[in-house]
Amino acid sequence: MAGVRFGVVVFPGSNCDRDVAWVTRGLLGCPTRLIWHRETDLSELDVVVLPGGFSYGDYLRCGAIARFAPVMGSLKEHAARGGYVLGICNGFQILTEAGLLPGALVRNANLHFICDRVGIRVERQDLPWTSAYPQGSTLTLPIAHGEGRYTCDPDTLKQLQDRGQIVFRYAPVAPNGSVDNIAGICDPSGRILGLMPHPERAADPDLPGQDGIPFWQSILRSFAA
């Protein structure tokens, strides 16, 4: 279904917006609009993506300033009416800062920026983001972050575990020290997803490492169902 309408938010300091648009527009063939952070009209969109990068230079902390951008109020309205929201890397950080997902992303345990390809286990295959993956899949996806260690209080962690909101885990172990090896979580509805790995960087059919392709195909499946 090539009619799924994507929007990719562009903050000052974003640097993965065009990577995402290349996948949604070039690979999936879906209409895709780059949305400047001051825009507020998201009414025609099905999926809004907050991409990776360093929004506002990561001043204060990652995502702390981006949460106040004009587009974020409209994003919350989009989510409230059942729209899909995806946050990748810095986008995940922004979603936690905005309260759309619980917990926080903090400095990596080793205090170093980590740029690598890592093992990622898919914990749920029944979501709009994962249905194209075989049961029990372990992927290889790129990560690139200095503040990617997921943390939350014990009660929140238990809720995430009990409600099945942990979608991706690092396998065999989190390189950044994330609690419970968490690499990505969703809200209770499954329509809002945040993850630190970059599926858009593993989706070019002409390059090695294509484990991100089923991620994007899953989104199309969910709208075709």
Swiss-Prot record:
Which InterPro entries does the UniProt entry name for this protein? Class_I_gatase-like (IPR029062), PRibForGlyAmidine_synth_PurQ (IPR010075)
* Signal peptide positions (record): none
Record's catalysed reaction(s): N(2)-formyl-N(1)-(5-phospho-beta-D-ribosyl)glycinamide + L-glutamine + ATP + H2O = 2-formamido-N(1)-(5-O-phospho-beta-D-ribosyl)acetamidine + L-glutamate + ADP + phosphate + H(+); L-glutamine + H2O = L-glutamate + NH4(+)
Q: Where is the active site?
A: C89 (nucleophile), H198, E200
Biological or metabolic pathway of the protein: Purine metabolism; IMP biosynthesis via de novo pathway; 5-amino-1-(5-phospho-D-ribosyl)imidazole from N(2)-formyl-N(1)-(5-phospho-D-ribosyl)glycinamide: step 1/2
Q: What is its main location?
A: cytoplasm
Enzyme Commission code(s) on record: 6.3.5.3, 3.5.1.2
Q: Listed GO molecular functions?
A: ATP binding; glutaminase activity; phosphoribosylformylglycinamidine synthase activity
Q: Which GO terms describe its biological process?
A: 'de novo' IMP biosynthetic process
The record's Gene Ontology cellular component field reads: cytoplasm
Q: Which UniProt keywords apply?
A: ATP-binding, Cytoplasm, Glutamine amidotransferase, Hydrolase, Ligase, Nucleotide-binding, Purine biosynthesis
User: Where does the UniProt annotation locate this protein?
Assistant: Cytoplasm
Per its UniProt record, what Pfam families does this chain match? GATase_5
Domain Glutamine amidotransferase type-1, chain residue ranges per copy: 6-225
- Biological role: Part of the phosphoribosylformylglycinamidine synthase complex involved in the purines biosynthetic pathway. Catalyzes the ATP-dependent conversion of formylglycinamide ribonucleotide (FGAR) and glutamine to yield formylglycinamidine ribonucleotide (FGAM) and glutamate. The FGAM synthase complex is composed of three subunits. PurQ produces an ammonia molecule by converting glutamine to glutamate. PurL transfers the ammonia molecule to FGAR to form FGAM in an ATP-dependent manner.
The record's HAMAP family line, in alphabetical order, gives: PurQ
Please give the subunit comment from the record.
Part of the FGAM synthase complex composed of 1 PurL, 1 PurQ and 2 PurS subunits.
What is the recorded name of this protein?
A: Phosphoribosylformylglycinamidine synthase subunit PurQ
Q: Which gene encodes it?
A: purQ
